[in-house]
Design a protein with these regions (language model features):
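Class I SAM-dependent methyltransferase SAM/SAH-binding core
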Residues: 52-110
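Conserved alpha-helix/loop element of class I SAM-dependent methyltransferases that forms part
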Residues: 30-47
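A short acidic, Gly/Pro-enriched loop at the edge of an enzyme's catalytic core
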Residues: 109-120
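A short glycine-rich, Lys/Arg-flanked "PGG" loop and its adjoining helix->strand segment in the class I
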Residues: 134-146
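C-terminal alpha-helical "lid/dimerization" subdomain adjacent to the S-adenosyl-L-methionine
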Residues: 8, 24, 153-207
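A short SAM/SAH-binding and catalytic strip from SAM-dependent methyltransferases
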Residues: 120-132
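Core SAM-dependent methyltransferase catalytic element
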Residues: 195-231
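N-terminal, positively charged/glycine-rich alpha-helical extensions of SAM-dependent methyltransferases
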Residues: 1-20
Length: 231
């Protein structure tokens, strides 16, 4: 796994690309990013849920969730970049879900929420740039309620050896241009979440061959079985 960009560098990168992020990410991923968001929301969110979209960026996933939770639900959009959340605020108003959405900035590795706070926690493509994605994933699990669901989408390595070699070479070039790579790299956090006690309900690879995503949904057991990673 490549060394992550610093949080300060990430803030600068995402501040720089905020206005074109949706277009750029969809173009690079051939719109597989949207497919992943839809699948995760479909398999995680129910009417009336209280949802955290962590690393929400411009709010695309959170808005999908806000539409599904209905008037009785709530969605918190949480992101490191105020510039990205500024775009999210505009989109939330355009989609007329502002009454059920709140916004907060902060670091995903140190979430300012108590244990078991949300019925559903979502993270779409936001763990990949973190300096400690395993700890970030553990934080997502911590704030998910017992019996709740955690839905994650992140970059993963191609399963074909030749394709992986080609992807690594392309990534070598992209990594020299943070505005292009967006600090994203392949990670692997599902084993750590299973180790905490999470039950896998869905696990699926999607996306283009060079830049595949792993999307998964886990359920946090109602009776705590977790081994509290790093705590």
């Amino acid at each position: 796994m490549r060394k992550a960009l610093s949080p300060e560098k990430l803030q600068g990168v995402y501040g720089h690309i905020a206005k074109r992020y949706d277009f750029q990410h969809a173009l690079i991923t051939a719109s597989a990013d949207q497919k992943g968001r839809r699948i995760l929301v479909e398999h995680s969110v129910s009417e009336g849920d209280e949802v955290l979209d962590c690393g929400s960026g411009t709010g695309t996933t959170g808005i999908m969730a806000a539409k599904k939770v209905g008037p009785s639900g709530k969605v918190t959009l949480f992101d490191l970049s105020e510039d990205m959340l500024s775009i999210a605020r505009e989109k939330v108003v355009q989609e007329n879900v502002q009454e059920r959405v709140t916004f907060q900035t902060g670091d995903m590795v140190h979430l300012p929420f108590g244990d078991n706070s949300f019925d559903v926690v979502l993270s779409t493509y936001s763990l990949c740039p973190l300096y400690d994605p395993v700890k970030g994933a553990a934080e997502l699990y911590r704030v998910t309620k017992a019996g709740g669901r955690l839905g994650v989408g992140h970059s993963t390595e191609p399963q074909n050896v030749i394709v992986k070699y080609l992807a690594d070479r392309v990534e070598d070039i992209a990594w020299h241009f943070p505005w292009l790579s967006m600090g994203c790299r392949s990670i692997n956090v599902l084993p750590a979440l299973e180790n905490l006690g999470g039950k896998v309900l869905l696990s699926k690879h999607i996306g283009v061959p060079l830049w595949p995503f792993l999307i998964f949904v886990i359920e946090k057991p109602r009776t705590e079985q977790s081994h509290q990673l790093g705590r």
